[in-house]
């Protein structure tokens, strides 16, 4: 029941001709022109985004070293301040133990350390 090759080719040509008759060639040209215009715009957008990414990468490289050094500086300052406040607390407690009358009642508890605890989460 299979058709011979010439009949199949003729049937395929007929189907193709009917499909071509359904669509206007002017419409196909307009679609291709619109697609070409869109392709150009997408390529321009891609070029702009690529340039922006390269610029952002360069800016990040410049800033990241500075940011890392500032972070290290802040961490060392925090460690230094923690050490200083630890020494101050121990000095205050030794003073309070040696000279209990030097501080009024309750004043020592208020002045021991009024800094907020930065390690605990905020409520």
Curated annotation (Swiss-Prot):
Gene Ontology biological process: lysosome localization
InterPro entries according to UniProt: KXD1-like (IPR039843), KxDL_dom (IPR019371)
Subcellular location(s) per record: Nucleus; Cytoplasm
Tissue note: Mostly expressed in leaves blades and leaves sheaths and, to a lower extent, in seedings, roots, collars and panicles.
Keywords carried by this UniProt record: Cytoplasm, Nucleus
Coiled coil: none
Stretches that traverse the bilayer: none
Chain ranges for the short sequence motif KxDL as given in the UniProt record: 78-81
GO molecular function: protein homodimerization activity
Main location: nucleus
GO cellular component: BORC complex; cytoplasm; nucleus
Subunit relationships: Homodimer. Component of a nuclear cell elongation controlling complex made of ILI5/BUL1, LO9-177 and BC1. Binds directly to ILI5/BUL1, ILI4/BU1, BUL2 and BUL3. Binds to BC1 in the nucleus. Interacts with BCL1.
PANTHER family associated with the record: KXDL MOTIF-CONTAINING PROTEIN 1
The family this protein is said to belong to: Belongs to the KXD1 family.
Role summary: Contributes, together with ILI5/BUL1 and BC1, to the promotion of leaf inclination and grain size by modulating cell elongation.
Name this polypeptide is given: KxDL motif-containing protein LO9-177
Taxonomic source organism: Oryza sativa subsp. japonica
